[in-house]
Amino acid sequence: LILAASVSALATDMIVPVLPLLQKAFHSDYSSIQLTISGFLVIYACSQLLSGFIGEKLGKLRVLTASFLLFLAGSLLCFMADSLSMLLAGRALQAVGAGAGPVLSKAIAKETFSPLTLKRALSDISSASAVVPLIAPLAGAAILGHLSWNHIFLVMALFSVVTLLLSPRRLGHRDSAAAPSSSLFITPAFIQGTL
């Protein structure tokens, strides 16, 4: 669950040291290259808003697993990218996949752990969410010291594979049926609070 909650920070911050290299590799202006981050964040935000609703309807664990498969596919597409458009398509897939992690990992924790264990689990998830943005750029720079820029996306792909292997199924979590009222969570108050 900690890995699931951390994937968005990893995907956002690990590529920061790569941006100048991407500009040279694709012979593009810097504003276009910055779409790899700004575009990611826009799609990621929309994905977060929808993932909780979809998770309630289809099952949180199922949606979380599907989202990491999307993130894996996006990471591999970025790894193989030979054009900026291919890279941006991969980043879009990554963003859609990353959106479910922070939302559903906490929801699954609440359904899986006892109240005492839940406090510890949520504390660990929050700590990881704070630490990963600090470590990710350093990890990206370290990778660039030995490998080419696209290997950063291979590391992200491996991260998603590890997260899938450490699925919450191992915690004994089973998706529960959604309450009938869960489909009505998008209310005027919700929209006003979001804005």
Regions found by a protein language model. Give the residues of each.
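Conserved MFS/SLC helix-loop-helix module at the cytosolic interface between two early adjacent transmembrane helices
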Residues: 46-84
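A generic transmembrane-helix signature of 12-TM secondary carrier transporters
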Residues: 68, 72-75, 90-91, 157-164
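Helix-loop-helix hairpin linking two adjacent transmembrane segments in secondary transporters
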Residues: 86, 123-168
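Cytoplasmic helix-loop-helix junction between adjacent transmembrane helices
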Residues: 90-128
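Helix-loop junctions on the cytosolic side of multi-pass membrane transporters
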Residues: 167-180
